């Protein structure tokens, strides 16, 4: 199956940075996450990228399917080898979310682009991008972190189950013209490398401080798998801080969803 990605141009677009210099471009694949994990186990370098035009079994967080049609969006996974502790995987997710939000915001001037904790990027409260991070440890050290990213770039039509909750860069731009997916990919990848390096160098607090002003749902009533409360922000370790009738709690793994109600109900 042909695709319109030009691997040589992609490498030129990311020249000057480490991530993306080792690049595997595919027309179709079951999952770039699986491809990148295999590459990591075979010794792929830090910053190796698998980019696909189409995925047949793309996946997101919590085992959900990531719908991955060809010719419209970008789906890629990065092999990262950061010198961090195994417990830091959650913070890598937040650093990447911050990076993707920053890149997305640059393509949709005048629109609200925010991180929906912990791994989605919204434009005007509709999902534009998703992140999945999985780590491989050897002993007590991280051998590799596989970072999967999907960004809705040019898609304008959605399956019924996503209508009203998903959007794309093209849909949110006043011009409405199709965007250059290669440029979008290079931009997102560059921001990702920058923020993961920032986390490794400056620690979790640097990510938390930069991310909090860019979080969606702050001060709103939200639900998660087994609770309801007001989302107040994130803790030093990246956990979601929520206020419930029973007090303030920290959620390390949850899926927050907004509730149309008055947060004062829990005051």
Go through each PLM region and give its residues:
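Long, positively charged amphipathic alpha-helical accessory segments at protein N-termini or as interdomain linkers
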Residues: 1-2, 18, 86-113, 123-267
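N-terminal lobe of the biotin/lipoate ligase/transferase fold
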Residues: 1-109, 264-267
């Amino acid at each position: 199956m042909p695709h319109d990605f030009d691997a040589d141009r992609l490498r030129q677009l990311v020249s000057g940075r480490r991530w993306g210099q080792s690049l595997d471009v595919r027309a179709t694949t079951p999952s770039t996450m699986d491809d990148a994990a295999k590459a990591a186990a075979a010794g792929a370098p830090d910053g190796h990228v698998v980019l696909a035009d189409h995925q047949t079994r793309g996946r997101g967080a919590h085992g959900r399917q990531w719908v991955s049609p060809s010719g419209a969006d970008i789906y890629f996974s990065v092999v990262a080898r950061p010198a961090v502790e195994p417990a830091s995987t959650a913070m890598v997710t937040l650093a990447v979310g911050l990076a993707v939000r920053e890149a997305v915001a640059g393509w949709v001037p005048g629109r609200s682009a925010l991180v929906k904790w912990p791994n989605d990027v919204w434009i005007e409260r509709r999902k534009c991008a998703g992140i999945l991070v999985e780590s491989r440890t050897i002993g007590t050290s991280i051998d590799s972190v596989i970072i999967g990213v999907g960004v809705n770039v040019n898609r304008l039509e959605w399956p019924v189950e996503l209508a009203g909750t998903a959007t794309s860069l093209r849909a949110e731009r006043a011009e409405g013209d199709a965007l250059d997916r290669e440029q979008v990919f290079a931009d997102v990848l560059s921001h990702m490398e920058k923020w993961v390096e920032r986390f490794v160098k400056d620690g979790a607090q640097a990510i938390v401080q930069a991310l909090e002003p860019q979080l969606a749902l702050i001060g709103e009533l939200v639900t998660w798998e087994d609770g309801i409360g007001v989302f107040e922000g994130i803790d030093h370790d990246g956990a979601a801080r929520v206020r419930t009738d029973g007090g303030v709690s920290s959620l390390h793994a949850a899926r927050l969803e907004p509730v149309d109600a008055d947060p004062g109900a829990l005051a």
